Amino acid sequence: MHLVFKFSPEADLETMLKLKVEINTREHESLYGIRQYPFEIDCRWHQAKAEILSFEPEELFGTKLRALLQRRKNRDLFDLHEGLKQLSMDPDKLIACFVHYLALGGKPISRAVAEQRMLEKLDRSLTEDIAPLLPAYIQFNDDDAMDAFGNVWSELIARIKGDPWKLSGQVIDELRKGKIPNLLR
């Protein structure tokens, strides 16, 4: 199931964008269970407190890693990087969730495939699909995207079980000689 929202980004009010929100109604097996989280709204016109049910952060971001590696979109890279920075997640627990949800779907992704797909993402912009979605006060430029790429690579991709992609070293060296001299340094 999905919902589509149309909006104008803050940076360009003349443009209309569509944001598709996908709701996964097929996966019902949680690896770490459901938790309650406090939620509070406090603004001029409404105040409320509630407990909301959700998954552990590692579980949510494990599916985010799966999305990053299964789709051509790069906005998941931003989300993973911010989650790793802000939520003090356990990367090994996140990878366990990633593996769990891949197994449920019957579509495993090895470390070699993960490395190949990540490096292929460098053939196009890492920022173009996220930039219009961010508020004006959040910057995510090409340098930020490369930091995010390196963080996700070292904290998550390198932890996926299996052998590295046999061409990773060669592709990284070529990219360092070309357009990305500081790649994964």
Q: Where do the protein language model's features map onto the residues?
A:
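Structured mid-to-C-terminal alpha-helical surface segments
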Residues: 1-185
